[in-house]
Structure formats: C-alpha cells, structure tokens
From Swiss-Prot:
This is Calcium-transporting ATPase 3, endoplasmic reticulum-type. It is a multi-pass membrane protein. It comes from the Eukaryota. Mg(2+) binds at D692, D696. The active site is at D347. Residues 70-89, 271-291, 767-776, 841-883, 936-950 are lumenal. It catalyses: Ca(2+)(in) + ATP + H2O = Ca(2+)(out) + ADP + phosphate + H(+). One of its GO terms (biological process) is root development. It comes from Arabidopsis thaliana (Mouse-ear cress).
Length: 998
C-alpha cells in the first residue's frame, strides 16, 4: 500500500480487512502471504562460476595472447619439436592468463557481500496480534495487515503504519535510512503532503529503524522488497560497476595496440614473401610457416604480458600506503580513480559531522540587580566522550565549573531529567548512547561540569577507568536524588518533568522547548551569587531573544528549570509545571568535525568540488556549510543550495545549470543520492560519494568511487571502494593526494613497459627486414617482458610524491596514458632499444673476437650458407652467443631506461637513483636473475643462452648506456617547451582523437 501515509487509520485497516483488536485470522495470513510474498529480501541470482571464469578472458589483449599461445603450440607440434623448451612459451602465456583470471574471479566473488549484509538490518522477531492473541513470531512470517506491537529498543520488522500510541510520545531513530541526525517523532495522523519523502511520512515506521522512545501499535503495510529497505536492495541490484578511468584508457590502449600488432605482423609476413622459397626453409609452405612464427614472436614481443600484473601490484602497494593514512582500499582500481575525482558528494551526518549531539553553548543569568545580565559559556568536545572543558564569555577556562550555581543546577537537571544511558564500549574503544541523542548530550554535559565541593575533581575524574568515567557524575546525582515520578514529554506541552526526593527536600526538574519552559517560570537562579529573584518582563524578553539567537545559529535549544515541592509528594501533574525557577539555556548541535574545514579548503585548492548531501532540513544544513567553509564565505548562496523537491521541480535545462553550482543538496532520500551521482556523471564528472548509512549504499556503489566511514554500517562498507578507518573527512584529502601520486607513477611504469616493448618490436621487425637470423627466441622475449621488465616497473611505483601534487587541477578522464609528445619520446627510446639489440646481435657475428667475423652480406644471406662454399660452418648461425648478447643488451638497456623513469621531466642529476632505492634494488635483483640464467647450465639450456665473456659484457655496456644520454636530451626539450622544434602531437595523438578529447 504505497499511500498508507495519506490514508486514515480506518482506511488502512479496511484495505487489509483487519480488526485492530483481533488481528488477522489464520486464513487471512495464508491469503496475504500468497498475495504479497514473504518478509525477506530476495537473494540475487549468483553468476555461475564458469561464467565468472570466462568473463576474465573477455579482453582483446588476452584473446591475442591466447591465439599466440595456441599458434605457438600448433607450430611446435607441426615441426615435430619435443622437449620442455618447445612448449615453454605457450605454457608460460597460459599460466599468466590463468593467474590473472583467478584474481578476477576472487575479486568478483567478494563483491556481493553488500546485499547479504543488508539483511542484517531486518529484525529477527516481532510481537504480533493474530486471532485475538499476541505472540512472538519470526519477523520473516509477517504479512501486510498484521498488527504489531512496537516499543522502545525494538527494531522495526517491516514497513508499518502507526494506528495507536500507548505513550505520550513515540520516537524513532531512522538515521540509517534518511541520514537525519536526530530521532524523529511519529504519530497516527495522516500526512497530506504531496510527493512526500521519507522524512515527511510521520506515521510510517520503516523497516530496520529503531524505536528510541514510546510504545504503540502499527499495521504492516509492506514486506520484503516492498519496503524502504527493499527499494535500496533493488537499487543495488540494478547498479553496474563502472570501469575506472585507468581501466578505460588501458582498454583503449589495448584495442589500439592490438590493431597495430596485427598490422605489423601482417606487414612482416608480407615483406618476407620473397624469402618463403629460400632453400634453407625446405619449400614455400615451410618458409611461410617460418615467417608466420616470426610474426607470432612479434606479437609476443609487442604485448606487455606483465602489464596487468604490474598494474595490480603497483595499485596493491598503493593501498598499503593509503592504509597508513587510514584509508582502507577495498577495490584496487579505485586507487587511481581518486586522482581524477572532480566532485565529492559528502553525506553530512556522521561524515562532515560527528553524528554525536553535543552541548556547545550555555546561557545563564549572571545577575538581575539592574536588569538581567546574561552570561554565556561555551563547551568544548564534539563526541559522546565525557571529555571537554567549559569556557566563560572571555574565553577563559573554568577550572571548577560545578562551583558556579547555575552550572551546578544545570548538571543536576541534565542528569536527573533524563532517560538515556551513556556507556563505554571496550570493543570499539568509544562511548555509545542508548536513547535520545539530545538527552545523551545533556548527560555528557553533566560529566563535563563535574561535581561541586571537590577541588581535585578534574584530576580525580581523569584517574577513573573509561567504563567508570562514562557516567560517574550522573551516577552521583542519581544516588543523591531518588526519582519518584516522571511526566513524559508531550507535543502540546513540549517539556518533560521528573519529581526527585533528596533527604528532607523534594525537587521537580523540568526541561523542554525554551518558549514552554520560560512561559512557566516566574523566578530566575542567578549565577553570580546563587540567589533566586523574580523573572521580570524585561528578563523574559532578554531570554527569548537569546534562544532565538541560538536558533539563528541552528543550535537545538533546550531550557532547564526546577521547582521545590512539598516533601513526601508522590506524584506530580501538569498543574505542577508552573512557578518554575529558570536555570539556563543549552544550545546543542551535531558538530562538524574539527578537521573538516581545512579538508574542504584543500579540496578547493585541488580543484575538487564538494557537494554536501543530507536528509536534514535546509536551514540546518546551510548553517553547517557556513561553518565548514563549503560556501566559500559567501553571504548570498542562492543557486548553491537546493532541497530534493526544489531540484526536481526545476526544468531539465535549469537542473543542468544547478548541478554546476550546487554545494548543498538537502531533504534527500536514497534515490535522490543515486540520481545526483548519475546526473553528475552525465556531465563527465568523476564522482566520489561518501557516507556511512544503509541509505548511502546505492549511491556508494553507483559512484566512480564510494567512500564509507569506518564506523558506518556493514552495508555501506561493502558497497564502497574505500573505507575511512578514522571516519575523518580530512583523510580523503590525503588519499586523493596519494591517488594522484600513484597514478603518476602508474603512468611512468606503463610508459616504461611500452618503450621496452617498442624496442622488442623494432628488434624483431628490423631483423626480419634485414633478413638476418632470429635475434631473440620467443621464450627470451617472455623472460624479458615478465621478469626483467616487471620488477623495475613495479619499483617505479615507489617514486616519491611531487610536492605540488594537490595544487594541480584533477586530470581529465579522457587524458591519454601516453600523449603525443610523450609517445614520440618513448618511440625514440624504443627505437634505440631495438636498434641496440640488433646491433649487439650483428656485432658478435661481424666484429667480436669470439665470433666468425662475417661480412654484412654473408650474415644477411645466411639462408644460402649450405649452397655456397664458406670458410665457416653453417652451424655458426645456430650459435647461442649472438642471441645471448642481444638479449643481454635488451635487458641492460632497459635497466638504464628504468632509471630514466624516476621522473617524467627532471634530470637524473636532479632526481637521483637515491630517491627510489626500491628501483635500485629491483635493477640489482633483475641483473642477478639474468646472470643466473646465463651461468646456471639447466637454465641456460631452457632459455637458449650461454655465458658471456668480459669483452662481450663490455660491448653490452657500450651499446646500452647511450639510452641515458638520449632521454636526458628529450627531458631537456620537455622542460624547455619552446625548443621542441614546434613538434606538436597533443592535438593529434596517435590514439584516436575522439577517445582522447572526450
């Protein structure tokens, strides 16, 4: 029943055909169960394991590698090759792909926990009226039409419509659903508001929320998916994970690379058609097969097999850095997404604020001799911890606040006129509330004021354990005074009173709305000397002025008073709530976190816009935004603050314009948060969404990066990409800075691997065009790509963060990983790497003292060796020395190139290798591994290599070192943009323009 909130009680009961005094009959229960379904959230249909596995191979580069492995395997069989080396290449490729698939399957298997944990917010049992009798049943057996009894402390088992109240007031904490910082009062009256949001439905109790005060009965109007919690569940089912910017760019690069690889492979094969019939191949067909193998080797060389593993490893290392900043990353790709975040949609309650109501101001009458002289105190501390101090109007700390008469009586009244509990939770190492937030705030105030008559009170309190300290002062007052009778809060009186007995004196303490309390007072307690004087009209007007000023600061204001009553009185009535003595006013709020203002400023400096999203009313939220600097100190912020209903009423064009300026979005429901994220994403914004409640989960999952609070619900955490362990909004800023640094390092090692692969492609291509023997075997290329490239590339991820990383604007989502000028730079480096490798191969044949010292012509016509008379054996072309020299040149030149990647533009003389000792260590380890395969015989056989002489190592160094000089020249040109010889590829990147300029 969707409009139950707008129907009267009798209409709702008639709709379900239920008698409120008897409940449903057994036959009605069976009928309603068939009609409406069970009160459970349906489980999402799980993806079969085999589909998850196949999904991991749905990538163009992966498919190319699979084809390369299959072709390599078939060719080995066709040529009759045997032994481990014949099948090593396809085996290694498939092993890599299997490992990547395993990681992907594990990640996706863990991604569905949010939906399971949402069920934790469903109540387990319910007190239900059926067949005229109350019974306790599992909540899953509830059906629409059931009459349910609800009382303080119970969790609402389904969506209910209030039909009867057994107490003067009934309040529910529905923060997990709406984000409201205070509990909400409920009643049985129908709501006539059109397009009512959850906050407007004052007669509806939502599934999963908690009753904090009162007792009543309600009728079930929605179960399972047809509840507010169920709609959140459905939203999460409908949310697909978006690819991160880096994933998108790597996918684009993979597509581009695949096309280039295919083109080069075909070109190499076509260029060598004339060599198919060379006698050395044994026929045209076998020649075609030979050059097809070269094309396959080229594909293996061109594809950076280690790139997925290196990206994953670098992001994983980044998560460890972020964990030290209290940002726990649940989704690896979200690490780099932080770097291009342009908008943070921040939940207000519990994220920007502490979600702990606390008293921040106290107003008392100091004296009344010449008219009322008001004195204001401020109170520090923004949590439920009984830690904080009281300051006078001059900012001076009060050492013993309880010695002030008014503060002394405020503490008594706050403690005794109170039904809440403040306790310490050792498991969470935090103080927690049971009951109303406002009442707990008064309990905490009583602890901060302390007790009178003890000069050593502050130090004595500090010596207590946290468990004892939680309510030490409150317990003192409760032991001094015995509660005799309580007049509960009602909406018409707007106050609560409690009768207490103390030795030979009975006192009635009252608290409530200032206008109600002040109207019932005729005397004032003066803080100066503790005297009680009459309350004059001038004094009344001054007090009213003060509580209105508290309201302007959006403080929730309460007034406290007391009255001495005849000793032995056992009850009090509403008639006794007159002739009260005014004690003071307290102003409380859900305070902003102390570090939020600086964090907001840092976000603005970094070009990141913050939109505050809350279920609270507009004026309260606007006040918070002013305090944290979200409005950038503007007096007029029209066009920057909207309620959900105001925004929805705007035409589409104005909504688009409003999104560009919006800073505050108030009175929202979960669907509005998700809608906001989607609308911003349509404007090409990269959106981070923070939150801690169940109500935030759909938006957290939809956002480019969802950020949950560490103290938030399990649902929010599981739907998020990152969790802030310390609930500190400021940690987001540190995480963004680290995310930007990680992305910069990711670009560096991607460029490093690309330039290395370009070198390998150039090597094979040049060798094929020149017609010389195979320079490198496929297994050698795999070794270089996976081991000798992978280790330094991973270490590049440890490059230090730039000092100005948070002064730059967010990078554009469409920014290419490799832009025009940079592609040119790494193309130059890659070409040199390839030519140096080929040069090393040729050097051994032509110039090395250990080689045959052939002429260029003899080397390029090696296929005809058997047909001519030579001074050297034809078996020389199968010698492992030249390919070993070439492979070693490739490895060493790439180690020098790794040093080039310490910085994109800074010289090695400025940013020295000492700045990243991990990289130095990885280079040393790589060289040790390379030496290992050269000088350990079984490994040398496996990789078709042989030990090198000192002269050969010297040649390797001569051919490798110039890569440092070349890159230093290119860096110099980058730093001096006017000296690039007008080389401009930024507007015409080698990647498709429509992909780069989105």
């Amino acid at each position: 029943m969707e409009d139950a909130y707008a129907r009267s009680v009798s209409e709702v009961l008639d709709f379900f055909g239920v008698d409120p005094t008897k409940g449903l009959s057994d036959s009605q229960v069976v009928h309603h169960s068939r009609l409406y379904g069970r009160n459970v959230l349906p489980e999402e249909k799980r993806t079969p394991f085999w589909k998850l596995v196949l999904k991991q191979f749905d990538d163009l580069l992966v498919k190319i590698l699979i084809v390369a492995a299959i072709v390599s395997f078939v060719l080995a069989l066709a040529n009759g090759e045997t032994g481990l080396t014949a099948f090593l290449e396809p085996f290694v490729i498939l092993l890599i792909l299997a490992a990547n698939a395993a990681v992907g399957v594990i990640t996706e298997t863990n991604a569905e926990k949010a939906l399971e944990e949402l069920r934790a917010y469903q109540a387990n049992i319910a007190t239900v009226l059926r067949n005229g009798c109350f019974s306790i049943l599992p909540a899953t057996e509830l059906v629409p039409g059931d009459i349910v009894e609800v009382t303080v402390g119970c969790k609402i088992p389904a969506d209910l419509r209030m039909i009867e109240m057994s107490s003067n007031t009934f309040r529910v904490d529905q923060a997990i659903l709406t984000g409201e910082s205070c509990s909400v009062e409920k009643d049985v009256d129908c709501t006539l508001t059109t397009n009512a949001v959850y906050q407007d439905k004052k007669n509806i109790l939502f599934s999963g929320t908690d009753v904090v005060a009162g007792r009543g009965r309600a009728v079930v109007i929605g179960v399972g998916s047809n509840t507010a919690m169920g709609s959140i569940h459905d939203s999460m089912l409908q949310t697909d994970d978006e690819a991160t910017p880096l994933k998108k760019k790597l996918d684009e690069f993979g597509s581009f690379l695949a096309k280039v690889i295919a083109g080069i492979c075909v070109l190499v094969w076509v260029v060598n058609i004339g060599h198919f019939s060379d006698p050395s191949h044994g026929g045209f067909f076998k020649g075609a097969i030979h050059y097809f193998k070269i094309a396959v080797a080229l594909a293996v060389a061109a594809i950076p097999e280690g790139l997925p593993a290196v990206v994953t490893t670098c992001l994983a290392l980044g998560t460890k850095k972020m964990a030290r900043l209290n940002a726990i990353v649940r989704s690896l790709p979200s690490v780099e997404t932080l770097g291009c975040t342009t908008v943070i949609c921040s939940d207000k309650t519990g994220t920007l604020t502490t979600n702990m109501m606390s008293v921040s101001k106290i107003c008392v009458v100091q004296s009344a001799e010449h008219g009322p002289m008001i004195n204001e105190f401020t109170v520090s501390g923004t949590t439920y911890a009984p830690e904080g101090t009281v300051f006078d109007s001059n900012g001076m700390q009060l050492d013993l606040p309880a010695q002030s008469p008014c503060l002394h009586h405020l503490a008594m009244c706050s403690s005794l006129c109170n039904d809440s509990i403040l306790q310490y939770n050792p498991d969470k190492d935090s103080y927690e509330k049971i009951g109303e937030s406002t009442e707990v705030a008064l309990r905490v105030l009583a602890e901060k004021v302390g007790l009178p008559g003890f000069d050593s009170m502050p130090s004595a309190l500090n010596m207590l354990s946290k468990h004892e300290r939680a309510s030490y002062c409150n317990h003192y007052w409760e032991n001094q005074f015995k509660k005799v009778y309580v007049l509960e809060f009602t909406r018409d009186r707007k106050m609560m009173s409690v009768l207490c007995s103390h030795k030979q004196m009975d006192v009635m303490f009252s608290k409530g709305a200032p206008e109600s309390i002040i109207a019932r007072c005729n005397k004032i307690l003066c803080n100066g000397d503790g005297s009680v004087v009459p309350l004059t009209a001038a004094g009344r007007a001054e007090l009213e002025s003060r509580f209105y000023s508290f309201g302007d600061e959006t403080l929730r204001c309460l007034a406290l008073a007391f009255k001495t009553v005849p000793h032995g009185q056992q009850t009090i009535s509403y008639d006794n709530e007159n002739d009260l003595t005014f004690i003071g006013l307290v102003g409380m709020l859900d305070p902003p976190r102390e570090e939020v203002r600086d964090a907001m400023l840092a976000c603005m400096t970094a070009g990141i816009r913050v939109i505050v999203v809350t279920g609270d009313n507009k004026s309260t939220a606007e006040s918070l935004c002013r305090k944290i600097g979200a409005f950038d100190n503007l007096v007029d912020f029209s066009g920057m603050s909207y309620t959900a209903s105001e925004f929805e009423r705007l035409p589409a064009v104005q909504q688009t314009l409003a999104l560009r300026r919006m800073t505050l979005f108030s009175r929202v429901e979960p669907s509005h948060k998700r809608m906001l994220v989607e609308a911003l994403q349509k404007q090409n914004e990269v959106v981070a969404m923070t939150g801690d409640g169940v109500n935030d989960a759909p938006a957290l999952k939809k956002a480019d990066i969802g950020i949950a609070m560490g103290s938030g619900t399990a649902v929010a955490k599981s739907a998020s990409d990152m969790v802030l362990a310390d609930d500190n909004f400021a940690s987001i800023v540190a995480a963004v800075a680290e995310g930007r640094a990680i992305y910069n390092n990711t670009k560096q090692f991607i460029r490093y691997m690309i330039s290395s692969n370009i070198g390998e492609v150039v090597c094979i291509f040049v060798a094929a065009v020149l017609g010389i023997p195979d320079t490198l075997a496929p297994v050698q290329l795999l070794w270089v790509n996976l081991v000798t490239d992978g280790l330094p590339a991973t270490a590049i991820g440890f490059n230090k963060q730039d000092s100005d990383v948070m002064k730059a604007k967010p990078r554009k989502v469409g920014e290419a990983v490799v832009t025009g000028w940079l592609f040119f730079r790494y193309l130059v480096i890659g070409v040199y790497v390839g030519l140096a490798t080929v040069a090393g191969f040729i050097w051994w044949f032509v110039y090395s003292d250990g080689g045959p010292k052939l002429t260029y012509s003899e080397l390029m016509n090696f296929e005809t060796c058997a047909l001519r008379e030579t001074t050297y054996p034809c078996s020389i072309f199968e010698d492992r020395h030249p390919s070993t020299v070439a492979m070693t040149v490739l490895v060493v030149v790439e180690m020098f190139n790794a040093l080039n990647n310490l910085s994109e533009n800074q010289s090695l003389l400025v940013i020295t290798p000492r700045s990243n000792l991990w990289l130095v260590g990885s280079i040393i380890l790589t060289m040790l591994l390379h030496v290992l395969i050269l000088y350990v015989h079984p490994l040398a056989v496996l990789f078709s290599v042989t030990p090198l002489s000192w002269a050969e190592w010297t040649a390797v160094l001569y051919l490798s070192f110039p890569v440092i000089i070349i890159d230093e020249l290119l860096k110099f040109l980058s730093r001096n943009t006017g000296m690039r010889f007008r080389f401009r590829l930024r507007k015409a990147d080698l990647l498709p323009k429509d992909r780069r300029d989105k």
